Amino acid sequence: MLMKKVPHIIHRANQSGGKRYERMVAFVAFFRTNLLHDRIFISAGSLAFQTLLSIVPVLAVVLSVLNLFEVFTPFQHSLETFLVENFMPATGRLLHGYLLEFVGKTGNIPLLGSLLLFVIALSLLSTVDQTLNDIWGIRAPRKALQGFTLYWTVLTLGPLLIVSSLAASSYVWYTIFTDEGALFELKTRLLALFPFINSIVAFFLLYMLVPKRRVRIAHAFAGALVASLLLELSKRWFLFYVTHVATFEHIYGALSVVPMLFFWVYLAWVVVLVGAEFVYCLGAFAPSTPTAEAQGSLRYLSLPLAVLATLHNAIEKGAPLSLKSLSRELSTLPFNLLRDMVDLLLDRQVLHLSTRGELALSRNLHAMSLYELYQIIPQPINATEKSLLFSESKSVHLAPLSLEVEACLQERMATPIAELLQHSFLKASTVD
């Protein structure tokens, strides 16, 4: 009896493996499309430029906060080394000296200049917040008081948490583990993993707390793990590039640290944004499933009608949607297909983008008929059908019949779209 079930079990396993592979391929395509659509590499460039302008003010604020607490004074040098050497591989010591020299000069500036440094540091955090929320399709800025409180908390509590972590780690390593015996090798390996673990924790908190959307813990952890691995690979590649390939020192001399610093900061922001995009895609990805849609000539209208119905209902509720928000409402549709349809409706001036990047209706659905929408949506014709339609040797004169069909369609599809959507909504409510 068991032997008879073996082929069936193998068949089901093969089907399951094939579905997993198809789902993985579809997710990779979805992830790649979102990377290009959200212009991750352009956003990373703008963040890198702003980071170069803000790095000294941020370090000045961080070190000023630490100076307020004498208990953290012994760990200040450790924090400086940790931030700078992990901030840029290969040139950390040189950069350490420059940055501390610049930060030291900020102590002599007047009160107005100190406030300006603080504002610059806050602006960097605000840009990071806005860029990450753009990935989730959230363009509504935080309220001024809420944003100020959040950024102030990050600037003040962030350094304290890092120093506390370093202090706790130092206590564990130097009290529990000794420099002699079998635990020495274990201690060395754990210390080597410490920066990687710190990266995972930092990315996890970033992806969990910054987006103004509910993010699953598993998705945030997966994104943090991916970003941490990419960061480690980027460090190794950058170290190899600087030591074996780059010619910055031959061209710029003492100023070579500037382009190298910008290049590394750009890579770091690419890693951060790629990880955020990965977290978003884990939550937004929904593989297409076959539906029982009628296979008639009107089947191409189901998608645009779903888009218009969703936007129409959202606008009536006073909550317009962006493309990302629309994809969450229509989660069963592939994102690529939905984006192409939205682009088509934008091109045909049925929709337009508001100043905040939200989708809005350009046509009055109470005046626009179903036939007008039918004319807008292209119906694909395969190569065989084209050859039959346009073959001169076997031409069939269908012009009179085509006119009659068009007239019939125009008459039968004169129903306004809004009325059709209302009837569909009432029917769905009755069924429920």
Curated annotation (Swiss-Prot):
Belongs to the UPF0761 family. The chain crosses the membrane at residues 52-72, 108-128, 148-168, 190-210, 220-240, 254-274. GO terms for cellular component: plasma membrane. NCBIfam families: yihY_not_rbn. InterPro entries: UPF0761_bac, Virul_fac_BrkB. This is UPF0761 membrane protein Cag_0935. It comes from Chlorobium chlorochromatii (strain CaD3). Pfam families: Virul_fac_BrkB. The keyword Transferase does not apply. It is a multi-pass membrane protein. It is found in: Cell inner membrane. Keywords: Cell inner membrane, Cell membrane, Membrane, Transmembrane, Transmembrane helix.
